[in-house]
């Protein structure tokens, strides 16, 4: 997980074009898509928008392995992953997805080598504190929120996070939520403590506590669509790794075998369109 990218790449011939019948005409060469994703078409392909896909979450996994496989540094692996986040962000915007949540840095990642962690903190500050990137995201109408315990970061990084949120808070385009120093367990714990304090102070009673109230205390209260419809995880790992444990209760899961920096536009499209085949029952019978 551990990489982050904001600046969008220039337009290319490999793009999605919206049409009047709520479909995208996707023109690209799909021959390079990995066979385990069952994509083997080449040429024009008509891709229908998945209904009900409002919130997509992603666990970016495989940056260090990717770098090792190519004889590159871990730093280069994280930068390569940041470029692929740009691709996914653009796709989600074009498809009309409302929310994209990116697991950028977990509370467990502090155990990584000090050199790697220091680089990531500098990379976050470089990207988030960039006036060029801030202007671009403001211009493109994207809203940015950060969830997780930000108090541990340097003052300069905390200020950059606050400026990014403040400058984009009224934007109505894709809402990008970046989980940084985030833990699903800690999110539940802090919400529980917050409610307990309110009960102790007389602001709430025990009878007032229900799922809706609890969700208002979670970090994801910053969005109307707090529960992801689809979670994408790369590198072949099949676990959620302490990410959004409450919010993922009914989320559809998609596991890609490719390492995150190896993911191409067509791979992300395959992941997003997989949502069309899911039957979401929420514990009940198929409707």
From Swiss-Prot:
Coiled coil: none annotated. GO terms for cellular component: chloroplast; chloroplast stroma. Keywords: Chloroplast, Magnesium, Metal-binding, Plastid, Transferase, Transit peptide. Expressed in leaf trichomes and stem trichomes. Residues 1-34 form a transit peptide. Its main location: plastid. Its EC number is 2.5.1.-. Its cofactor is Mg(2+). GO terms for molecular function: magnesium ion binding; prenyltransferase activity. The active site is at residue 61. It is an enzyme of class 2 (transferase). SUPFAM superfamilies: Undecaprenyl diphosphate synthase (SSF64005). It is found in: Plastid, Chloroplast. One of its GO terms (biological process) is polyprenol biosynthetic process. Belongs to the UPP synthase family. Uses geranylgeranyl diphosphate to catalyze the cis-prenyl chain elongation and produce polyprenyl diphosphate with a chain of 35 carbons. This is Cis-prenyltransferase 7, chloroplastic. The lineage of its organism: Eukaryota, Viridiplantae, Streptophyta, Embryophyta, Tracheophyta.
């Amino acid at each position: 997980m551990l990489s982050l990218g904001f600046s969008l790449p220039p337009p290319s011939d490999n793009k999605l074009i919206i049409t009047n019948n709520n479909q995208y005409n996707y023109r690209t060469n799909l021959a390079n898509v990995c066979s385990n994703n069952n994509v083997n078409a080449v040429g024009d392909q008509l891709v229908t928008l998945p209904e009900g896909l409002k919130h997509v979450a992603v666990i970016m996994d495989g940056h260090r392995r990717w770098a090792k496989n190519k004889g590159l540094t871990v730093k280069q692996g994280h930068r390569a992953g940041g470029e692929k986040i740009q691709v996914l962000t653009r796709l989600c915007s074009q498809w009309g997805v409302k929310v994209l949540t990116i697991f950028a840095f977990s509370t467990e990642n502090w155990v990584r080598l000090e050199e790697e962690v220091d680089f990531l903190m500098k990379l976050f500050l470089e990207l988030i504190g960039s006036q060029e990137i801030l202007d671009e995201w403001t211009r493109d109408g994207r809203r940015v929120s950060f969830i997780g315990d930000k108090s541990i970061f340097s003052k300069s990084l905390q200020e950059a996070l606050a400026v990014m949120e403040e400058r984009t808070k009224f934007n109505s385009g894709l809402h990008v939520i970046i989980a940084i120093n985030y833990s699903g367990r800690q999110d539940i714990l802090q919400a529980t403590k917050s409610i307990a304090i309110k009960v102790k102070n007389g602001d709430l009673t025990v009878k007032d506590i229900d799922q809706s109230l609890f969700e208002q205390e979670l970090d994801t209260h910053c969005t109307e669509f707090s529960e992801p419809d689809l979670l994408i995880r790369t590198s072949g790992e099949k676990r959620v790794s302490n990410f959004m444990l409450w919010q993922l209760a009914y989320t559809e899961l998609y596991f890609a075998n490719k390492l995150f920096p190896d993911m191409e536009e067509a791979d992300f499209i395959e992941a997003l369109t997989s949502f069309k085949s899911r039957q979401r029952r929420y514990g009940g019978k198929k409707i």
